[in-house]
């Protein structure tokens, strides 16, 4: 079984919706890292000219490769990543190997058999 890691940088108010969307699309769980900060091309400024950095959450999803594209696209739609600037981004990278997921592998095999 091969895995991908989806890393989503999400506005903190959208984290729960993105997590639910990932589960609906086939993810079996996730890890959330709270209070990340970042900015895009343009800095967010307040009316006093100060820089305003919005809080983000980092959502990590270790998913089976055959489900990965669908999960990535679904969280992008729900999070409105392409529709509104600054709402978030998600990337997907290959995972060479993983340990500690034997209990999820059996469940994933059943999900894959149903969906493929």
What do these predicted ranges mean?
Residues 1-116:
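Positively charged, small/polar-rich N-terminal and surface patches that mediate targeting and assembly
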């Amino acid at each position: 079984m091969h895995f991908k890691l989806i890393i989503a940088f999400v506005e903190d108010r959208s984290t729960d919706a993105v997590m639910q969307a990932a589960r609906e699309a086939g993810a079996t769980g996730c890890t959330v890292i709270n209070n990340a900060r970042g900015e895009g091309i343009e800095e967010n400024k307040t009316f006093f000219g100060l820089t305003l950095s919005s809080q983000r959450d980092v959502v990590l999803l270790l998913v089976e490769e055959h489900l990965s594209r669908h999960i990535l696209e679904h969280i992008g739609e729900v999070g409105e990543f392409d529709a509104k600037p600054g709402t978030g981004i998600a990337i997907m990278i290959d995972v060479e190997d993983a340990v500690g997921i034997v209990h999820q592998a059996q469940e994933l095999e059943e999900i894959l058999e149903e969906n493929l």
